[in-house]
Design a protein with these regions (language model features):
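Alpha/beta enzyme core
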Residues: 1-253
Length: 253
């Protein structure tokens, strides 16, 4: 399986992130290419969010410095529909707007995409570990931060509540993000749901291992295995990680 993210062409960002829902977006084109080449041999998951496409870098419609939750939901639904139309097997909303799973599920069903699954970022924390990805995707907020809609790192009860809500709204899989500093959250959510549970071994976690290995401070293969085993032991059924290709090619797993 692969999880696809996209960025618009230079100068194409706008206040509402409209390039994200274009049928000719980078993500839609990548989905079509992968499906034409590999068909059902690969599960294609697509990220559904606005932050890489908005001129302000926030994950929703911004007005007077505040993200407007309900006005964002139709935009997220449109992104999911564009990805489903391109052939995505699963859409993965990462925005953390309230009610987005229900809005996306309703939109998919009404468009006859009942078989397209939803992997919900149920517990996405306002973490400093996202830094390298935000630099690469040029999605750092131009003003403020995302603490108003992403979760407080000190709060595990909210993760359980969000997992229950997303399951009730129609999510097929749930996710905890990041992974290594949140193994207790993975365990807590695992004990509350029978849905498949994913975790995201994010860019900062990956970069820390790579940087330490480059300096000879640790054995990369052993540490990668240990980290992935820890996530699995905590209860993750699926792991999204930047280590995957190298780990497979080098036989680390």
């Amino acid at each position: 399986a692969v999880l696809l993210f996209g960025t618009p062409e230079d100068g194409k960002k706008d206040e509402r992130g409209t390039p994200a829902s274009s049928p000719s977006s980078a993500v839609a084109r990548a989905v079509e290419a992968l499906k034409q080449r590999a068909g059902d041999e690969i599960v294609v998951i697509t990220d559904v969010c606005l932050c890489a496409y908005t001129s302000h870098g926030h994950c929703g419609v911004l007005r007077d410095g505040k993200v407007i939750n309900d006005e964002t939901l139709p935009l997220l639904k449109d992104i999911a529909l564009a990805h489903a139309g391109a052939g995505a097997d699963v859409v993965a909303p990462s925005d953390m707007m309230d009610g987005r799973v229900a809005a996306i599920r309703k939109g998919l069903d009404e468009a006859n995409y009942e078989d397209v699954g939803i992997l919900s970022y149920a517990a996405k924390y306002a973490s400093a570990y996202y830094g390298p990805f935000r630099d690469a995707a040029e999605s750092t907020p131009s003003t403020g931060d995302r603490k108003a809609y992403q979760m407080d790192p000190a709060n595990v009860r909210e993760a359980i509540r969000e997992a229950h809500l997303d399951e009730q709204e129609g999510a097929d899989m749930l996710m905890v993000k990041p992974a290594l500093a949140y193994l207790d959250v993975i365990r807590a959510v695992r004990q509350e749901t029978r849905l498949p549970l994913a975790t995201y071994n994010v860019s900062g976690e990956y970069s820390a291992v790579k940087a330490a290995a480059a300096r000879g401070w640790l054995d990369e293969a052993t540490v990668v295995r240990e980290n992935l085993v820890g996530m699995t032991r905590a209860g993750a059924d699926l792991i999204i990680t930047y280590h995957s290709r190298e780990a497979l090619e080098r036989g680390w797993l």
